[in-house]
């Protein structure tokens, strides 16, 4: 019998017990589609002195030279870099990592957001494989031509998209400040930008009884990097948005801040830095928030968002519990892989098993759409 289950978005768990996030490893992803395990060459360092804000920084400067890496060949949703990092970690420990779900932060954020946003603004189209007692969740790659900035660089959407990357480039350095030549500092506004170079942190966390391993892109180090395995307390999230001038603007920003809070609290990033721009995409001000203060800001400023953060955590607990209860995860059968489709429609998360005659089945179960062959072999070798 084919497995099928659904969960209404109003469902809430009684638990709000979150596990303390811990960084287990990291990797760098290159713009030419490479994965560098335990490499921090793509890690950036925050540097945006107040005097820079007086220089009329243009967040559209260089948009025509922007290198868009979201192409057919570049799968931004692949788990392979995360799995390679996990494999290296397990080889050092000589044992399997005890978690129930392995995925990216963006997937968990979208699943949480499904209780607050419509599917039009928060599309959920995921694939899950059950292997070796664990669930691996991947987002279905969208058509690059639909999401690419190359479609129309003059559109408001494309300019807003680019301005976020530009803000990151203006606010960060590729090395700690003492190691950066003055000429490099002065040329920062002219730096050509791409969205393929990424630094990804591998974090173990969870809620209730569910243990989760999450890959999360890190924007920058805020202060300094320790020579240790866990630098979560030093990371910062960078965002750029329009200035807040009206009550309507404030409520719009609060909704954005809630989503940013979700991103950060999931993996234990404590600092959020927002750049505010005018309608001409000139950077005007920068404001810092601690992740822990965001729920209080939302509660005090917007009556409609008084309980939204606690609500989000209870929904997080509900859908992870539902996934673990619904999908069989046999620990003693390393040779069986089963695949599932997870979508969001009509106010429900819907889970359906993918049968062997489905066109997706072969790549999901026998191919490398989610699990790499090397990772599957490693888990088999671990049992010998």
From Swiss-Prot:
One Pfam family from the record:
RAI1
- Which keywords fit this entry according to its UniProt record? Hydrolase, Metal-binding, mRNA processing, Nuclease, Nucleotide-binding, Nucleus, RNA-binding
Subcellular location per UniProt equals: Nucleus
Q: Which cofactor does it need?
A: a divalent metal cation
Top-level lineage group = Eukaryota
> What Gene Ontology terms describe what this protein does at the molecular function level?
metal ion binding; mRNA 5'-diphosphatase activity; nuclease activity; nucleotide binding; RNA binding; RNA NAD+-cap (NAD+-forming) hydrolase activity
Protein role: Decapping enzyme for NAD-capped RNAs: specifically hydrolyzes the nicotinamide adenine dinucleotide (NAD) cap from a subset of RNAs by removing the entire NAD moiety from the 5'-end of an NAD-capped RNA. The NAD-cap is present at the 5'-end of some RNAs and snoRNAs. In contrast to the canonical 5'-end N7 methylguanosine (m7G) cap, the NAD cap promotes mRNA decay. Also acts as a non-canonical decapping enzyme that removes the entire cap structure of m7G capped or incompletely capped RNAs.
Q: Which PANTHER family match?
A: DECAPPING AND EXORIBONUCLEASE PROTEIN (PTHR12395:SF9), DOM-3 RELATED (PTHR12395)
What family does the database annotate?
Belongs to the DXO/Dom3Z family.
- What is the name of the protein in this document? Decapping nuclease RAI1
């Amino acid at each position: 019998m084919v497995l099928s289950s659904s969960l209404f978005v109003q469902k809430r768990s009684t638990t709000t017990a979150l596990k303390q996030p811990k960084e287990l490893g990291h990797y760098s992803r290159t713009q030419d589609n490479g994965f560098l395990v335990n490499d921090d060459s793509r890690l950036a360092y925050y540097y945006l002195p107040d005097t820079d804000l007086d220089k009329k920084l243009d967040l559209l400067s260089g948009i025509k030279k922007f290198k868009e890496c979201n192409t057919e060949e570049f799968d931004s949703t692949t788990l392979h870099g995360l799995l390679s990092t996990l494999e290296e970690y397990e080889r050092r420990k000589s044992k399997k990592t005890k978690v129930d779900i392995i995925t990216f932060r963006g997937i968990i954020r979208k699943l949480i957001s499904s209780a607050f946003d419509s599917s039009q603004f928060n599309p959920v189209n995921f694939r899950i494989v059950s292997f070796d007692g664990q669930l691996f969740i991947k987002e279905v790659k969208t058509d690059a031509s639909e999401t690419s900035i190359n479609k129309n660089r003059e559109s408001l959407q494309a300019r807003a998209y680019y301005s976020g990357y530009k803000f990151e480039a203006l606010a960060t350095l590729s090395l700690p400040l003492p190691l950066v030549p003055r000429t490099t500092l002065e040329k920062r506004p002219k730096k050509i930008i791409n969205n393929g170079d990424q630094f990804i942190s591998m974090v173990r966390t969870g809620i209730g009884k569910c243990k989760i391993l999450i890959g999360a892109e890190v924007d920058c180090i805020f202060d300094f990097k320790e020579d240790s395995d866990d630098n979560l307390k030093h990371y910062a999230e960078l965002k750029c948005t329009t200035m807040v001038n009206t009550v309507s603007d404030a409520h719009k920003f609060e909704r954005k801040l809630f989503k940013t809070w979700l991103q950060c609290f999931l993996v234990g990033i404590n600092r959020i830095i927002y750049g505010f721009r005018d309608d001409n995409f000139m950077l005007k001000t920068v404001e810092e928030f601690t992740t822990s203060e965001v729920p209080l800001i939302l509660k005090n400023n917007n009556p409609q968002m008084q309980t939204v953060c606690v609500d989000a955590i209870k929904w997080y607990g509900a859908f992870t519990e539902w996934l673990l209860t619904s999908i069989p995860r046999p620990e003693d059968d390393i040779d069986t892989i089963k695949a599932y489709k997870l979508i969001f429609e009509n106010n429900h998360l819907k889970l359906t098993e993918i049968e062997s005659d489905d066109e997706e089945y072969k790549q999901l179960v026998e191919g490398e759409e989610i699990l790499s062959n090397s990772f599957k072999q490693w888990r088999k070798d671990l049992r010998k």
